[in-house]
UniProtKB/Swiss-Prot annotation:
Gene that encodes the chain: rps2
Pfam (any one): Ribosomal_S2
GO biological process terms held by the UniProt record: translation
Protein name: Small ribosomal subunit protein uS2c
PROSITE patterns cross-referenced by the UniProt entry: RIBOSOMAL_S2_1, RIBOSOMAL_S2_2
Domain of life: Eukaryota
């Protein structure tokens, strides 16, 4: 796989606070190779390592997208949810940004059934069918539709398992990560200093609590995905 240049600059990462890890008391010793210093009780992430692994991840998603592969982005913490939705829509990726429902991937047949119910309800609502129902039943179905939209809206067009999953906040999305490992789906994880870098195929050391840091990482990845899709369209 030929390496490409993704314009990952040290000053931009510093401005986005990518380098700020967790408290020195809340860390995983496996992250030691990715930590450059301690400052005021906080571990400082080695941004040279961040740039290296982010670049590798961009290469991977670029070439995967150029072959028409599908992506799922998962990030449900308060700092990530909006950034995940926006980035995913830009790159036409599937996403989960509110809550990971256990078995979403490993029990795909159940997820497919839920998605079909969701699509059917949406279609019924668009046609005005819910307005013809008794008030109590219509209210119940509208609540159900709102719940399905909240938790499945980002994967409503997903017709099969994703080829690559991008995970923000390894701790919070541990169930999603384990499902990917069970199914052999490659993962790219943004990992803070309290994470295990060995659990993902590509682990990008970065601050997973700051919105600016999450946006920086996601912007680079979705840009690479978009470039990959564009390169596919340009092929004769």
């Amino acid at each position: 796989m030929k390496k490409k240049y993704w314009n990952i600059k040290l000053e931009d990462m510093l401005e986005a606070r990518v380098h700020l890890g967790h408290s020195t008391q809340n860390w995983n010793p496996k992250m030691a190779p990715y930590i450059s210093a301690k400052r005021k009780g906080i571990h400082i992430i080695n941004l040279t390592r961040t740039a290296r692994f982010l670049s590798e991840a961009c290469d991977l998603v670029f070439y995967a997208a150029s072959k028409g592969k599908k992506f799922l982005i998962v990030g449900t913490n308060n700092a990530a949810d909006e950034a995940v939705a926006r980035a995913s829509k830009r790159a036409r990726c599937h996403y989960v940004n509110k809550k990971w429902l256990g078995g979403m991937l490993t029990n795909w047949s159940t997820t497919e059934t839920r998605l079909q119910k969701f699509r059917d309800l949406r279609m019924e609502q668009k046609k005005g069918g819910l307005n013809n129902l008794p008030k109590k039943e219509a209210t119940m179905l509208k609540r159900k539709l709102a719940r399905l939209q909240k938790y499945l809206g980002g994967i409503q067009y997903m017709t099969g398992l994703p080829d690559i999953v991008i995970i923000i906040d390894q701790h919070k999305e541990y169930t999603a990560l384990q499902e990917c490992r069970t199914l052999g789906i490659p993962t790219i994880s943004l990992i803070d200093t309290n994470c295990d870098p060995n659990l993902s195929d590509i682990a990008i050391p970065a601050n997973d609590d700051a919105m600016a840091s999450i946006r920086f990482i996601l912007n680079k990845l979705v840009f690479a995905i978009c470039q990959g899709y564009f390169s596919q369209l340009r092929k004769p």
